[in-house]
């Protein structure tokens, strides 16, 4: 088996595979010796390994014996023995890379190996899954092995309280969903004291379904938001107005990037309807914001595709998994625009208080690895963004699934009729059938076509998510037909029922090419697990969403030269190349978008690191607040001098009265020197005139050093001012990011433009924080009444 895989790999990966095979042989050589040990002797190996690491040995020095110990423990506790290929997968993960392993190859058991080894270092290991159910399942299953070997295992899920979270993070190995680890990071950086923080420094993480977490979820940042009021009436009015707008006449919409903007006619129509002169005037900023969000809600979001309406609420749907994203809402008024569009009650608007992208969160881990059945197609991105390689792992048994050639029809109607015929054919044979769809809407469309032929099926989408485990459990039974969104693409295996193996196994039908080959491959991979028989076939049409979004003009040209049969099946072979090429364009577009967004987010990530580092310093009880404030005084004076001593103006034109007033706000001094064009001709002159005054003032501030109550008060005030300024900063950055794409007409790279303006905004934010702290100290000292 290993030899058959080698020829599929490049030279460097062949060499690595050979190295792994040698290590596997060394692990196997220890099996008999370890099997003779008692449970207590085997458990004592953990203490031995920890001592070796403490004495200077490395993870590489102990990995062979440690892997052999985990394998022996799994045999005793679970009755499961790691296959050689699973040991190879574990070695790949230990090196911080991605193990590509098809469905059913036992990825969960593979993770037990590197998690044990890295947990021996005593710094914590995080095992990331895509949902709570899998986190609990894996913790309960693999946790038994690690606990048998003397390690502590924790579970981090949204439902537990902070004290339980703290215990979960203190464990040697912590299971949970990736978003919750990210939200805990944000919450820790909003904490009012060190005691409220739950995480410890990051060390090593293994991400199950790593492509789903790091690529599919990469477009959605993690956001903790507070509430701010919004105008329900204006939202409803804008939603009503936008329904009368016509595409291309009043607005343009780019389906590829899902961006929308008003045309000149659209702007004029808004100005006429609201009886205003210029929509872009500052006084109409709120109206413009509500209108653009109403437009986005109207054209970029589709009910039963991007969201569902349930119990009079908008519930967002993850287009990659097909699942409802519990507790998630759109920010900046877009969620309220969707509510207005659907005629629902308007909820309070969210204001971002803390945020981070999935990419920048996981890049904080010194060592990161992952497993998935489908990663090779995205290897370039994994390498560029995360410095990880993808290593295809040999299967324990050969894959014998038959992946049939796609069939392409002219119309969607012809396609769905062909799907129905294929279902009838395989159903007559008694084979179970899984029909994969792109959205809730499409799953219900397929269901209607099957209803017309009185075909019995079960439907799995975000509306029936609570029945997911039961539906998947029966999806491999004889004669069973399951229509599912991408929810069925990951997680629980579809096991074949009695007699199904002999009939040919599970038959998978794809009803549309996804915007990534990975997702197509995941769907195919539901059949043919662990050497089972199975088959897959995709039914496509020229009306499919991907072709409409990325190749509408090409479709129109192509249609003229196609040959079809009486069912609408396209017989011209070049259509397959066209579909494949469009999918590659689509993947490239998404990659470029993620890369562009990451470049922008790297800017705010650097700013976030500065703020959070300062914030954590403020939380330390032994931090001397006076030592922090003294430099702020100099910074604030310098900022005020720049504000009023404007370069390019004559000193006689400078506003010395306002300059003096601003200095009095931040300096509690009895006699402020007289400032005028007579003694100040430059910022340097101001520093010279104020030198003695500043020195005396800072001496007064330094005298507060021993006042412990004031130190504590300053700590709380600093945290309050910093958090307040950071929230406002995030708001400003959101608006900057929204507007930067519209300014590409300028002869400047939008990324560089964003970096420049983001720096200006950050310097303003930080300067404002320092001024507020200086004002607070000045008020505490008491500004004398006889200030001149």
UniProtKB/Swiss-Prot annotation:
Keyword annotations: ATP-binding, Cell membrane, Cytoplasm, Membrane, Nucleotide-binding, Protein transport, Translocase, Translocation, Transport
Membrane topology: Peripheral membrane protein
Recorded catalytic activity of this chain's protein: ATP + H2O + cellular proteinSide 1 = ADP + phosphate + cellular proteinSide 2
Entry EC number(s): 7.4.2.8
CDD domains: DEXDc_SecA, SF2_C_secA
MF term (GO), any: ATP binding
One GO cellular component term noted in the UniProt record for this chain: plasma membrane
Subunit structure: Monomer and homodimer. Part of the essential Sec protein translocation apparatus which comprises SecA, SecYEG and auxiliary proteins SecDF. Other proteins may also be involved.
Protein name: Protein translocase subunit SecA 2
Higher taxonomy: Bacteria, Bacillati, Bacillota, Bacilli, Bacillales
Gene: secA2
């Amino acid at each position: 088996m290993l030899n058959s895989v080698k020829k599929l790999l490049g030279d460097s990966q062949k060499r690595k595979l050979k190295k792994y095979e040698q290590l596997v042989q060394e692990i196997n050589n220890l099996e008999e010796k370890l099997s003779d040990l008692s449970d207590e002797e085997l458990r004592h190996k953990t203490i031995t390994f920890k001592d070796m690491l403490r004495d200077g040995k490395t993870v590489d020095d102990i990995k062979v014996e440690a892997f052999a110990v985990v394998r022996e423990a799994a045999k005793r506790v679970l009755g499961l023995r790691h296959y050689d290929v699973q040991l190879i997968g574990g070695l790949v993960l230990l090196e911080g890379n991605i193990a590509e392993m098809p469905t059913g190859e036992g990825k969960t058991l593979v993770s037990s190996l590197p998690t044990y080894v890295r947990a021996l270092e005593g710094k914590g290991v995080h095992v990331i899954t895509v949902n709570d159910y899998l986190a609990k399942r894996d913790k309960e299953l693999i946790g038994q092995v690690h606990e048998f070997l003397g390690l502590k295992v924790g579970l981090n899920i949204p439902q537990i309280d902070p004290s339980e979270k703290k215990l979960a993070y203190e464990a040697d190995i912590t299971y949970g969903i990736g978003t919750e680890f990210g939200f805990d990071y944000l919450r820790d950086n909003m904490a009012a004291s060190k005691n409220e923080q739950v995480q410890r420094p990051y060390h090593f993480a293994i991400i199950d379904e790593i492509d789903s977490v790091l690529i599919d979820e990469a477009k959605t940042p993690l956001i903790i938001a507070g509430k701010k009021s919004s105008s329900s009436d204006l939202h409803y009015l804008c939603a009503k107005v936008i329904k009368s707008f016509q595409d291309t006449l009043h607005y343009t919409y780019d389906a590829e990037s899902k961006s929308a903007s008003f045309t000149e006619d659209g702007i004029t129509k808004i100005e006429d309807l609201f009886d205003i002169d210029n929509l872009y005037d500052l006084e109409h900023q709120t109206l413009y914001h509500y209108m653009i969000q109403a437009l986005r809600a109207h054209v970029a979001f589709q009910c039963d595709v991007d969201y569902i309406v349930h119990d009079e609420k908008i519930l967002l749907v993850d287009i990659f998994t097909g699942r409802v994203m519990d507790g998630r809402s759109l920010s900046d008024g877009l969620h309220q625009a969707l509510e207005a569009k659907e005629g629902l009650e308007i909820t309070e608007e969210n204001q971002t208080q803390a945020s981070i992208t999935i990419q920048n969160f996981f890049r904080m881990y010194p060592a990161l690895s992952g497993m998935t059945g489908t990663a090779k197609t995205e290897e370039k991105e994994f390498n560029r963004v995360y410095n990880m390689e993808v290593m295809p792992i040999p299967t324990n048994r050969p894959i014998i699934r038959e992946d049939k050639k796609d069939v392409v029809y002219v119309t969607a109607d012809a396609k769905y009729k062909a799907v129905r015929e294929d279902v009838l054919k395989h159903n007559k044979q008694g084979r179970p059938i899984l029909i994969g769809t792109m959205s809730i809407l499409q799953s219900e469309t397929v269901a209607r076509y099957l209803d017309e032929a009185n075909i019995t099926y079960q439907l799995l989408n975000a509306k029936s998510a609570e029945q997911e485990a039961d539906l998947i459990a029966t999806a491999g039974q004889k004669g069973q037909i399951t229509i599912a969104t991408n929810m069925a693409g990951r997680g629980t295996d579809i096991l074949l029922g009695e007699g199904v193996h002999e009939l040919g196994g599970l038959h998978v039908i794809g009803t549309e090419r996804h915007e990534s080959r990975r997702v197509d491959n995941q769907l195919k991979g539901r059949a043919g697990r662990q050497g089972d028989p199975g088959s897959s076939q995709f039914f496509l049409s020229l009306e499919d969403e991907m072709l409409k979004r990325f190749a509408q003009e090409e479709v129109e040209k192509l249609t003229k030269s196609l040959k079809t049969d009486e069912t609408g099946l396209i017989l011209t072979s070049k259509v397959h190349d066209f579909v494949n090429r469009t999918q590659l364009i689509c993947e490239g577009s998404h990659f470029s978008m993620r890369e562009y967004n990451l470049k922008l987010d790297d800017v705010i990530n650097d700013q976030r690191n500065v703020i959070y580092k300062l914030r954590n310093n403020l939380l330390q009880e032994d931090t001397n607040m006076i030592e922090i404030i003294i430099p702020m005084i100099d910074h604030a004076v310098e900022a005020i001098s720049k504000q009023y001593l404007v370069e390019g103006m004559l000193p006689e034109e400078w506003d010395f009265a306002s300059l003096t007033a601003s200095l009095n706000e931040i300096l509690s001094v009895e006699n402020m020197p007289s400032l005028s064009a007579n003694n100040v001709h430059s910022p340097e002159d101001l520093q010279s005139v104020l030198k003695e005054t500043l020195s005396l003032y800072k001496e007064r501030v330094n005298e507060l050093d021993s006042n412990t109550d004031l130190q504590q008060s300053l700590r709380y005030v600093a945290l309050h001012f910093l958090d307040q300024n950071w929230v406002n900063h995030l708001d400003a950055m959101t608006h900057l990011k929204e507007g930067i794409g519209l300014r590409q007409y300028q002869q400047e790279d939008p990324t560089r433009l964003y970096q420049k303006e983001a720096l200006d905004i950050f310097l303003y934010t930080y300067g404002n924080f320092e001024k507020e702290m200086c004002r607070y100290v000045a008020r505490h000292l008491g500004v004398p009444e006889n200030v001149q």
